[in-house]
Amino acid sequence: MNKLIYGLAGPTASGKTSLSISIANKINAEIISVDSSLVYKGMNIGTAKPTLDEQGDIKHHLIDIIEPTESFSVADFITNVNKLKKEIWSRGKEVLLVGGTMLYFKGLIEGLSSLPESQLEIRQTLELERKAKGLQYLHQQLNKMDQESAQKINPNDQQRIFRALEVIMITGKKYSELVKTSKVGGLEEQLKLCALVPNDRSILHNNIELRFKQMLDQGFLDEVQSLRKNPKLTKETTAIRSVGYRQAWEYLDGDISYEEFVKKGIVATRQLAKRQLTWIRNWQDEINLVEVENQNKEQQILEYFDYK
């Protein structure tokens, strides 16, 4: 009989952490984090990383596994999941994937494009061009070479602009076409995925604001100050571009006021939640949607997982 893998997705501040731990207890599971920010050590408050007390007796994976200066790709995530699932099953446990990084879920569901690896020389060339002419110029160049990719990539998204241009320069082909035609990896097993969705978006927005202010009370700015002591980290580092951290960095640089920092941090988190919900809505035919406000949501999820 083919093994099943269970999943719980949802936007930030939707209550995934406490719900997932309760569910993991019920189905005898270990949790694999599906969150691109939780992999980093020393980034605890701003990522709402579950504490050891919150984790309780449930073993969690892919939390605190790399330094903020290191990178962790979708391919790295898939490789880790495929290794961890076997270890978890060998212990007689179920696998429960929990998080809000939808690109990770997408990689598991659809597989990953087998595109060429990054080349340092090309990256350095692109970085020199960015410094000389600006990121908007590079986005315009991408638009000339691959309009479809340029339309999908935000003009301020340096990481994705660089990657698209890099692949075009290496292969001589359009990035958008290669992404569609070269898929590898993904899960062999069936993924039974539930996603939390708010019936009332204003409640989620209020929760986001409340949690952001709680993070400040818990010492979020002290956490960022500690990260700033590492000379290898800047506000352009992938880890520091996580929601909240970049805005805190700008405030501590003196670029914005404290009030602007708080406002921008909350707005950025709400925008993240909106993007997460867009992913979920696009997948609603393949996953089970569960309203955040539903008082019986845990039971609904357990029934979908065939645990009564």
Swiss-Prot record:
It catalyses: adenosine(37) in tRNA + dimethylallyl diphosphate = N(6)-dimethylallyladenosine(37) in tRNA + diphosphate. It is an enzyme of class 2 (transferase). Pfam families: IPPT. Residues 35-38, 159-163 are annotated as: Interaction with substrate tRNA. The keyword Nucleotide-binding applies. Its cofactor is Mg(2+). Substrate binds at T12, A13, S14, G15, K16, T17. GO terms for molecular function: ATP binding; tRNA dimethylallyltransferase activity. Its EC number is 2.5.1.75. The record marks T101, R123 as: Interaction with substrate tRNA. InterPro entries: Dimethylallyltransferase, IPT, P-loop_NTPase. Keywords: ATP-binding, Magnesium, Nucleotide-binding, Transferase, tRNA processing. One of its GO terms (biological process) is tRNA modification. ATP binds at G10, P11, T12, A13, S14, G15, K16, T17. Belongs to the IPP transferase family. Catalyzes the transfer of a dimethylallyl group onto the adenine at position 37 in tRNAs that read codons beginning with uridine, leading to the formation of N6-(dimethylallyl)adenosine (i(6)A). Monomer. This is tRNA dimethylallyltransferase.
